[in-house]
Each structure stands twice: as C-alpha cells, then as structure tokens.
Regions:
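Conserved, well-structured ligand/cofactor-binding cores
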Residues: 1-477
C-alpha cells in the first residue's frame, strides 16, 4: 500500500519523543526512526520476502508459547497469529521499508516486525492503529523476547528457506551438464594440464566432470544449512533468559517445529549461541566453495569455446548478443562472464560475513545485519546465475566434433599412451622429434618400425586412451 495517499497522520511516541506516522502505515515510530537513521544501502527488508517470512514465523511461535503461559489473552494471541499468517501469505511486505544494513544488532528490523504485526492485530481486534494499550509491539508481540534471540532466529529460518530455494536451481544446472556429458560421450578430444596438451579424453568426460564437482557441493551446502535449525529462541538479551518465564523456550521451539515442519532445536548453551554467528559464516563459506568451482567451470567454457577461427573452438556457446560496438560479427561468452562476476561478488560477500562474524564482542555480535544481507543476497545471485548459465549457455552448447578429433590426431600428447609399450625414454624421443619436425606421433612410430600399424591402432584407439586398459601387446623397451 502507498502510505502517503491521504496525507493523514497519527501520533506515536517512544523514548526519544513523539512523531507523526502516516495514517495508512502499519509500521510505527521506531520503524520511522530506523528509516531516517539508516538510509544506507538501498537493500530494503521488503525485498527479502523469506526473511520477512522468518520474522512472521518467529513472532507466531512466540505468541503461541506466550498464550500457553498465560501471558496473552485469547484475543491477542489470535490476532497476532492472524496478522502473522497474512504476512506469510505475502501481504503487507511493503510495510517493511527499513534498510537491511543497520546499527543496533537488528533492533530496527525486529521493531519493524513488531509494529506491523501489532497494528494489523489491532485492526483485526476492531481497534485503531496505534492503540497499543490493546496490543503492544513490545509488551505483546515481543513478549518474552529480545531482538537478540528473535532476530537471529528469524534469520536462521529465512536462510533455511533460501537454502531450500537454492538447491533445485543448482541441481538443474548439474543435470544440464550431465545431459551434455551424455550427448558428447563419443567425441574424442585432448585433455590439458597447465594449458598444455596432456592426454586424450572425451568431451563428455569434460562436462560430466563439471557436473560431478558441483554435485559434491550439495552435501556441503546441506551440512552448512543444518546449523540454521539450531536457534537461541528464549535466550532474550544475552542468553540468560531474563524476562522469559520457565518453559517458554521449550514451548517456543515446539511451536516453531509445528509451524515449519522442520527439526528445529534449541541451542545447548544460549549464552554462547547469542553471540555466535558461525552458521552464517559456514553457509557463506559453502557458497564460496560453489563459486570457486563455478569460476573454474566458466573459465573452461570460455577457453574451450574461444575462437571462432583462432582459438580452441572445441564447442560453440549460444550467440546471445552482438559482442562489440566496433568489431562486426564478434560474439562474446556473456553468460559464463556474468557467472564469473556473480562468483566474485558472492566470494566478496563471504569475506564480509567472515569479518563481521569475528566482530562479536562479549555477549552479542552487533554486526549480524550485514551478515544477513550478504547471505540472502548471495543466494539470490547464485539462483539467477545458475539459471542464466543453464538456459542461455549450457543447454545450447554445440560440439565441434571434427575440430576435437583433429586436435587429438595432431597432438604430441598421444605419445603418453605409448609409455607402457615402448617405455618413457623412447616415447620422449618420439615426442621431441614430432615437435621438431611437425610429423605426427603416429607416423613417426611407423617410420621407425617401433610398432606395427595394427598395434599402433590398438594403442591409440579412442576407447583405449580414455580409461584404464590392459593391452595384449609385448613391450618394446
């Protein structure tokens, strides 16, 4: 909703004083102060729907627990839960305008949620916005809570949602590489180490390799994400549970499990957990691992597709757009390039998360807001990058089979396949002569009478060079 449609206002007060709030706004005075104090990054909470979902779930669970303890009336509990339910349905997200990067260890975000939920609950109860004597952002929505347990719990829940959102996009990219691996399984090409000719392989093995190294990362992401299911709800300010009644933490955890269906658990040491943001550090690191491999893959895609006439040219990437404002006909590998840049950004975010993670002091880490922003942003970047690379690059790759085969036939690297039969010393002599004369390894072996044509064809057949084999040929060393 547009909070400036009528120009009408209401008056709300806090510790600092009284302020006019747009009458249509569900948020209140503390959110307004947060807007004014932290116009920093343009990353608004409203742009992070799964974080907002985490906040709503956290507040809903707290209301359920507080009602069981007799701290809320039925009317207050029902209204708070209904307001949270509307937020979970995607409503009122425009009422979360605060900057993700903020001072105060997340208090602005927590109060934004408290105020929106309280004012919507008031409406559902038949009262006016701002009539907090009936349902207060602090006394009722935030009952038994501190920012220091509600905010990180909401981050954990939101990030676990993001993790579940990320995995299918990575799996689809892996499947695309696997499909190309199968399609190119019979295309022989040269492998390379240190950018130099090595030994033959298939183009399919290259793409299956891409798929396999990414597949390994799913387990690492799952392992890192599991830490999000351990929360400090009930810790309140510093982990001692001040202002929370006995049994509140356990009831809140039970409510969180009921709402989400996840195996959410209470930290075994709430004091330690309240200052510990290592789960964000761990997940950011897991995303960095993915990016290290994505950079390798995208660099390979760009190199192996280089050309079209004067590069390696083993395959063609789909032409997506003209590549130059001055060079006619030039087409660039824009999809791998943008994935490279996404990887750099995510790796930069990981460094930010690491530095903020080590900034914890005493019983709290006040730098958690930037850690949350970086992690949520990184997941979004990876999702967009994976989809772009898959649909606008990998799915449309076309192999240049003749070019790949020609490279193998003209490569000196095939001499390695002769090692078991003619020995390393003789193979070295052949390689040196081939390099000096330009004559193929195949022809030189025949010219010197080292092997018969039948023996040579057996050794250098594609199927015998791309996997371990036992050759029935007598060594000539």
């Amino acid at each position: 909703m547009d909070t400036k449609l009528t120009g009408k206002t209401r008056i709300e007060s806090d510790l600092i004083g009284a302020r006019e709030i747009p009458a249509e706004a569900l948020y209140g005075v503390q959110t307004l102060r947060g807007i004014e104090n932290f116009s920093i990054s343009k990353f608004r909470l409203s742009e992070y729907p799964l974080f907002i979902k985490g906040l709503a779930i956290t507040k809903m669970a707290a209301a359920m627990a507080n009602f069981e303890l007799g701290l809320l009336t039925v009317e207050q509990k029902d209204a708070i839960i209904a307001a949270c339910g509307e937020i979970l349905d995607g409503k009122h997200h425009d009422q979360f305008p605060v900057d993700m990067i903020q001072g105060g260890a997340g208090t602005t975000t927590n109060m934004n949620a408290n105020e929106v939920i309280a004012n919507r609950a008031l409406e559902l109860m038949g009262h006016e916005r701002g009539e907090y004597q009936y349902c207060s952002p602090n006394d009722h929505v935030n009952c038994s809570q501190s920012t220091n347990d509600a905010y990180p719990t909401a981050i954990h829940i939101g990030m676990y949602f993001k993790h579940l959102q990320l995995l299918p996009h990575l799996e689809e990219l892996i499947a695309s590489f696997r499909k190309k691996g199968e399609e190119f399984s019979q295309i022989i090409k040269m492998g390379r180490t240190q950018l130099e000719d090595a030994v033959p392989m298939t183009l399919g093995q290259t793409f299956n390799g891409f798929a396999s190294i990414l597949q390994d990362e799913i387990a690492h992401l799952n392992e890192a994400a599991a830490d999000f299911l351990v929360v400090n709800m009930g810790a309140t300010a510093i982990g001692t549970g001040i202002c929370a009644e006995p049994g509140y933490a356990e009831k809140c955890i039970a409510a969180l499990r009921e709402i989400t269906g996840w195996d959410i658990r209470l930290s075994s040491d709430l004091v330690g957990a309240t200052s510990d943001t290592s789960c964000l550090v761990g997940y950011a690191s897991a995303m960095k691992r993915v990016c290290v491999k994505m950079n390798k893959i995208c660099n390979d895609l760009r190199l192996l597709a280089s050309g079209p006439r004067c590069g390696l040219g083993e395959f063609n990437l789909p032409a997506m757009q003209p590549g130059s404002s001055i060079m006619p006909g030039k087409v660039n590998p824009v999809s791998p390039e943008v994935m490279n840049q996404i990887a750099y950004k995510v790796m930069g975010n990981e460094l930010c998360v690491t530095m903020a993670g080590e900034a914890a002091q005493m019983e709290l880490n006040a730098m958690e807001p930037v850690m949350a922003q970086c992690c949520f942003e990184s997941v979004d970047l990876l999702i967009n990058g994976f989809d772009t690379l898959r649909t606008r690059c990998v799915d449309g790759i076309i192999a240049n089979e003749d070019r790949c085969r020609e490279e193998v036939h003209h490569s000196i690297g095939v001499v390695t396949a002769l090692n078991p039969v003619i020995g390393y010393k003789n193979s070295t002599k052949i390689a040196k002569e081939a390099l000096e004369t330009g004559v193929s390894v195949y022809q030189l072996v025949l010219d010197h009478g080292i092997l018969t044509k039948e023996e040579l064809d057996t050794i250098l057949s594609p199927e015998n060079m791309i996997k371990p084999v036992k050759l029935d040929i007598k060594p000539r060393r």
